[in-house]
Amino acid sequence: TLLLTTSGKVLASGLNVYGQTSNAEGKTNKFEEIKLNELIGKISAGDNHSVLLTTKGEIYTFGYNVKGQLGNGNNKNTNIPTKVSGIRDIMDISAGKNQTIILSSNKILYSTGSNEQGELGIGTDENKVLFTQIKTIDNMMSISSGNTYNVAIRYDGEVYAWGDYYHGIQNIKTKTNSRIPVKIGNDSSYANEKEITLNVNSSKQIEITPKYTFNVFKEDEMYNDFSYETINEEIAKVNAKGTITGQKVGTTWVK
């Protein structure tokens, strides 16, 4: 866990097997300050790596680096926050499971690390050890990374997603992993279909549009008794048979 103080200092606690808390010990059960002669404006913690954005627009990375998620040109883990050379004028950062996405002041996105699910958004499945421009979108305002997927917002309000479809970007038309950013729109939501399928113990995000009622089916025949629920019943309710009825337009999870 990383904490950012109002004075621009960073505190870290937790598992440190790969150096992700910048502590010499294997783990720490209390928050300790990360010694860095910089003022930090933003922080982001991935699965086992950490990213810091200074008030100068530079970034420091440390922790697990087998996939290249630190963006420093190699695959070596480090417990020392290290400035990424050649990277400046950054305004936003986001660390996913094994990928890091950054947003520059000229509204361009760059990515590094694991790309097995297309999470770098560069059109290939090749991992990167240096930050690489995502060339198919621009004029970006913010970025947020999930486990193996990412979502970004443009200044015009459009939302784009890419990466792992089955564990993240489940309201795009292709219904497969996407290696480039794909625009998310209401016309691609689950609520515009007559049914969706859930495996037992799985969940999916649904977007309720004016087409309010549709059915949910669970695939695993080993289970005789199914139960269904939605996270936000103000958006949608679900009965024992799996029929979801929307209450108002919005987004919720069904499982």
Question: Model-predicted segments: where are they?
Answer:
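Eukaryote-biased RCC1-like beta-propeller repeat architecture
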Residues: 1-195, 208-213
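Extracytoplasmic soluble-region selector
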Residues: 186-255
